[in-house]
């Protein structure tokens, strides 16, 4: 009886210790503060961009330099704000979106200091997965992901052995008409048994995937995991910005990884 009583008291003490050492629920006011600060940063970026465009309207080189500086400043402030407000839902979500620009040690520290109600959120789980996963980089072997095509058929990656693969993470719309035209020319230039062009879209339903296929060229293979934003593909391949481009050679080695699709860069990596 005494041992049971001691065990009961020990359990209570452990619970009290846990509650006293665990951060409280997230502060709704800080969530509002972050949303306001983020909106302010975005507005300032747009205003300054317009000001620079007018100021350097006749000097494209200077405009480009200033635009790069402005973007770097905005990116830095964006990351700083996300880390500062990582104890809020929106801040934590932004940390996941910026995970490739934040050291994994910093991300681990963020997770360790989360309020209790955010520790088991989808964004916390996604960041955990990112931390423990080695992201695909140039020189590494291609890792197949379970995906389906726009008709709902599971992609059989073995069918693409001994082919070059151009894998594009979303963003055909972001490429613009000229970019899509260059991609179409690339498709015409190489036989399908030499080059497979695969476009991954982070959608939840087949209907959405079919819409992209219908909107753009049916000459490409459209695929998706039909999962939320923190899918295994995004985690393993370190894909966030659209489009992100991967070229996998005939030996299954990733030989190119870039944000944006530079068709000339792609062609250099394709082995006929």
Which residues does each predicted region cover?
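Bacterial Sec-dependent N-terminal signal peptides
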Residues: 1-29
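Thiol/disulfide oxidoreductase modules built on the thioredoxin-like
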Residues: 218, 227-271
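Loop/turn elements at helix/coil->beta-strand transitions in domains of secreted/extracellular proteins
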Residues: 161-165, 191-196, 217-220, 250
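Structural microenvironment flanking redox-active thiols in thiol-disulfide oxidoreductases
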Residues: 178-216, 228-234
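Short active-site neighborhood of thiol/selenol oxidoreductases, capturing the structured segment around
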Residues: 155-183, 196
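Short acidic, S/G/P-rich loop/turn micro-motifs used as interaction or catalytic elements
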Residues: 172-175, 204, 262
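N-terminal "domain-start" segment that seeds a small globular fold
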Residues: 71-72, 123-157
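Preference for long, solvent-exposed alpha-helical segments and helix-linker "stalks"
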Residues: 22-109, 113-122
């Amino acid at each position: 009886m005494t041992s049971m009583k001691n065990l009961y008291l020990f359990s209570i003490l452990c619970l009290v210790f846990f509650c006293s050492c665990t951060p409280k629920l997230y502060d709704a006011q800080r969530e509002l503060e972050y949303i306001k600060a983020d909106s302010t940063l975005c507005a300032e970026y747009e205003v300054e961009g317009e000001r620079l465009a007018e100021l350097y309207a006749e000097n494209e080189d200077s405009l480009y330099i200033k635009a790069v500086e402005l973007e770097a400043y905005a990116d830095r402030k964006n990351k700083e704000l996300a880390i500062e407000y990582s104890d809020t839902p929106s801040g934590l979500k932004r940390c996941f979106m910026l995970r490739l620009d934040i050291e994994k040690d910093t991300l681990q520290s963020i997770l360790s200091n989360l309020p209790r109600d955010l520790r088991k959120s989808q964004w916390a789980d996604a960041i955990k997965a990112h931390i423990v996963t080695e992201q695909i980089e140039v020189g590494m072997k291609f890792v197949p992901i379970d995906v389906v095509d726009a008709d709902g058929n599971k992609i059989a990656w073995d069918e693409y052995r001994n082919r070059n693969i151009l894998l594009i993470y979303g963003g055909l719309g972001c490429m613009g008409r000229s970019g899509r035209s260059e991609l179409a020319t690339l498709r015409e230039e190489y036989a399908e048994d030499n080059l497979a062009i695969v476009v991954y879209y982070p959608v939840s339903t087949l209907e959405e995937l079919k819409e992209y296929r219908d909107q753009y060229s049916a000459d490409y293979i459209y695929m998706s995991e039909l999962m939320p934003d923190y899918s295994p593909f995004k985690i393993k391949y370190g894909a966030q910005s659209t489009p992100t481009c991967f070229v996998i050679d005939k030996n299954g080695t990733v030989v190119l990884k870039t944000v944006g699709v530079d068709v000339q860069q792609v062609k250099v990596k394709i082995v006929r």
